[in-house]
Amino acid sequence: MLYLAKMRNAEGELTENEQKIASFLLAHVSELKTVSSRNLAKQLEVSQSSIVKFAQKLGAKGFTELRMALIEEYSVNREKKHDTALHLHSTITSEDSLEVIARKLNREKMFALEETCSLMDFDRLKQVINLISKARLIQITGVGGSALVGRDLSFKLMKIGYRVACEVDTHVQATIAQALQEGDVQIAISYSGSKKEIVLCAEAARKQGATVIAITSLTDSPLRRLADYTLDTVSGETEWRSSSMSTRTAQNSVTDLLFVGMVQLNDVESLRMIERSSELINLLGRS
């Protein structure tokens, strides 16, 4: 959906406040990565709900979705105007210096972290932590970059005494999923929420009575619809991406939050196990 064109063509249909919002977004589209609905409401002296309703009027689910779409549109339009530079990743081009690349990557990652944190439903997160802490078995699924995030989480959870199954091979993931039981938990990590392998594993887990927790984007997807609980992640990457850099940053922020929350549930024993694990690893390093 071309939101930039929609805003330009909708002048006659907008209220005074909506026109104010549209004018700001059109004038500052290149700076939207650092703009939140709260800050925008304050700056324009309108209510935060007015901004959300404006986004929905254009066809977006909320301001975050509208802003991300505008950023992507702006990036694509700029690429068309400057097609001598090759897009390497997101807004990074072949003409950027290493210093510029570093700044762009940092901005992209900061955006992902801040937006993921601002969208977090902490009551839901607390429920999820309690569920995972009581699970007989925790399965973690993911492919590609999401699989790396899953492996990191599985290692951390095993350090504090949880039984975790996290296999990279998708055939093995499916085999584990179909053997889950009521009381087990599957943590499915997929930003798109539409990876066939992850969706099939989630379906199998649900069929067996296990609880499915999805770490995914805000976009409506098969995984999002299947999950009992969702933990939302936001990435500042556009379609021009060479790797899931800020996506992994957002996912890691959620999995790290899960881990620390679970350590907090049983802090003394968890810290004792982490210390024992470190001692053993140090002994291995000396051999």
From Swiss-Prot:
This is HTH-type transcriptional regulator MurR. Homotetramer. Residues 37-56 bind DNA. The gene is murR. It holds the Pfam family SIS. Represses the expression of the murPQ operon involved in the uptake and degradation of N-acetylmuramic acid (MurNAc). Binds to two adjacent inverted repeats within the operator region. MurNAc 6-phosphate, the substrate of MurQ, is the specific inducer that weakens binding of MurR to the operator. It comes from Citrobacter koseri (strain ATCC BAA-895 / CDC 4225-83 / SGSC4696). Residues 128-268 form the SIS domain. Keywords: Carbohydrate metabolism, DNA-binding, Repressor, Transcription, Transcription regulation. It comes from the Bacteria. Coiled coil: none annotated. One of its GO terms (biological process) is carbohydrate derivative metabolic process. PANTHER family: GLUCOKINASE, HTH-TYPE TRANSCRIPTIONAL REGULATOR MURR. Transmembrane segments: none annotated. Residues 1-77 form the HTH rpiR-type domain.
